[in-house]
Amino acid sequence: MNVLGIESTAHTFGVGIVSDDDSEIRILSNERDTFVPKQGGMKPSDLGRHHSEVAPEVLQKALIKANLSIRDINYIAVSLGPGIGPALRVGATIARALSLKYDIKLVPVNHGIAHIEIGRFTTRSKDPLILYLSGGNTIITTYLDGKYRIFGETLDIALGNMLDTFVREVGLAPPYIVNGVHQIDLCANKGGNFIELPYIVKGQDMSYSGLLTAALRATKNNRLEDVCYSVREVAFDMLLEATERALALTGKKEILVVGGVAASVSLKTKLYNLAKDWNVEVKIVPPEYSGDNGAMIAFTGLLEARHGVTIPVEKSIIRPRWRVDQVDVTWRLSEN
């Protein structure tokens, strides 16, 4: 079985191909092109335009890398949400067109679930507490009775969005990432004087909007490097407090970190220290799969296809607010 996955929920258009020939799952290709604004944030219309322009080349590269033609594909998996409308529509439209033209079955994939499943696959995690951390999501979740249950999440903006917005507003970005390191870390590593900023954890939920506002205000009277350091420390410590509470509640022995923020070296260090205190193991998705990518969509699509989860083209409607706890995780029922 060959599954082609299409990712287009936000700034990245990606195509990945996964095969399970001989009962071994292999990632054959994982091509992508990411939109980087020249200034300011991401405009939905710009994302849609970018994805439409790069899609043919990214698709062709993925097929060539996998040494396959489109007629070798058995299923097309597409991320239908959550995400940004104009971006989602490009991926969905391409998936529908390929499905109709080549008579290939369509598989609907939740973007967040795909981050989780590629993380479980690449790290060999069994039953972890999951930290899903990205530009659009900050979620603490774990699997129970056919669904991923959310134990904690942001009450407003996501951790990744908060960090990106801060470095952009103070003139450090774009680019947001330099040689694999986020601008907040590059700046924070030059600081060290802690500035008191809002620390808001309610149960296992976090709030980052107040931290962002206060941090931007603090740059007027403090060294930028010290503000960066303080923002990073407060933001990650809030997450760790919520994580500890979730560990106490669930009793899990593994922590799996997925999503773009998983690449942060500072966060990894804090989590490894937490793991020692709680006698748990921390597993972090490899960098090539931490950001948005097509391979994670293809892989999750393969899991779904194995269990007969397909949809007709007319029902492949994008769902910009599709939560991970709304998905029936049928493929995990057979694991228990």
UniProtKB/Swiss-Prot annotation:
Pfam families: TsaD. One of its GO terms (cellular component) is cytoplasm. Keywords: Acyltransferase, Cytoplasm, Iron, Metal-binding, Transferase, tRNA processing. It is an enzyme of class 2 (transferase). Its cofactor is Fe(2+). GO terms for molecular function: iron ion binding; N(6)-L-threonylcarbamoyladenine synthase activity. It catalyses: L-threonylcarbamoyladenylate + adenosine(37) in tRNA = N(6)-L-threonylcarbamoyladenosine(37) in tRNA + AMP + H(+). Substrate binds at residues 132-136, 164, 185, 264. SUPFAM superfamilies: Actin-like ATPase domain (SSF53067). Fe cation binds at residues 111, 115, 132, 292. Binds 1 Fe(2+) ion per subunit. GO terms for biological process: tRNA threonylcarbamoyladenosine modification. Its main location: cytoplasm. The keyword Acyltransferase applies. Its EC number is 2.3.1.234. It is found in: Cytoplasm. InterPro entries: ATPase_NBD, Gcp-like_dom, KAE1/TsaD, Kae1_archaea_euk. The keyword Cytoplasm applies. HAMAP family: Kae1. Belongs to the KAE1 / TsaD family. Required for the formation of a threonylcarbamoyl group on adenosine at position 37 (t(6)A37) in tRNAs that read codons beginning with adenine. Is probably involved in the transfer of the threonylcarbamoyl moiety of threonylcarbamoyl-AMP (TC-AMP) to the N6 group of A37. PANTHER family: TRNA N6-ADENOSINE THREONYLCARBAMOYLTRANSFERASE. This is tRNA N6-adenosine threonylcarbamoyltransferase. It comes from Sulfurisphaera tokodaii (strain DSM 16993 / JCM 10545 / NBRC 100140 / 7) (Sulfolobus tokodaii). The gene is kae1.
